[in-house]
Amino acid sequence: MSIFAGKTLMITGGTGSFGNAVLKRFLRTDIAEIRIFSRDEKKQDDMRHEYQAKFPDVAHKIKFYIGDVRSLESVRSAMPGTDYIFHAAALKQVPSCEFFPMEAVRTNVIGTDNVLTAAIENNVGAVICLSTDKAAYPINAMGITKAIEEKIAVAKSRNSRNTKICCTRYGNVMCSRGSVIPLWIEQIRSGNPITLTEPKMTRFIMSLEEAVDLVLFAFEHGHNGDILVQKAPACTIQTQAEAVCALFGGKKEDIKVIGIRHGEKMYETLLTKEECAKAEDMGNFYRVPADNRDLNYDKYFTKGDVKRATIEEFNSDNTYRLNLEETTAKIGALEYIQNELNGVENLAK
């Protein structure tokens, strides 16, 4: 963590699951300050009390800023002195964004533009924008707005000399706020049916710790305008539900199929065919460089030696598919799940 020594990190949307995961990773390091920028004062107050109680010796490093990424002035007021930004503020519930698409535009599109504008004005060293697999071949409002977020980030990076801007794409982050596993646990404990949308639907899965790892990899190894993804495994929704049943004593026969919700796909894509054509294989990650040609399309060719991706498209149907045993082990290893099994209260539950 030496690269963050004495630095100030801002996390937009910082009261969410990702912000909590970053805090737990960074608080006991040599980082100077972590700024939590969000619009919900109740969540900030809850977080303040939780961290003062559980991390009394280092909680002073957390500074809270009430504001909304939709307001450029709001973002600007919190920006001076910031060295790095993890931009996690977003509307991410697919059905909600289908019914209120302009709200998704205001947060995911205009909000991102505001954060990047203020960051460039203040010579912030690096901004990592958190995106989603739904931004690749998007069919729903959430995915479309996150795709535009990525386009804004890449466009801003072309003229950004002092601020590095990268995007990271995630699949489903297990046990994050608003995700399905906590809902299933609640349904099992209350004796209600375990609801899933479509048994054969596949999704990439990753832990919150892996989500933080991806952002740190982008921070350390990404170039201006890059999009980076992890080589995540996938499983069917049916397998995931059965794994949660196995861990919490649910019954397979209690699983109830309720049908695909508004805007959902049968499978998700982390890298499109077009992106795979230029993606660099970096071990556990892929890096998609920005196309930095100008509108004159001046053609030039350079000889490179990077290892290109050898797949035509990276999606949750053609990636490694976890079986029930593997899925159960991956879910069971999560800190959130261990806490739930052992009766320990989770932060930002």
Predicted regions, residues:
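Conserved Rossmann-fold cofactor-binding substructure of NAD(P)-dependent oxidoreductases
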Residues: 63-84
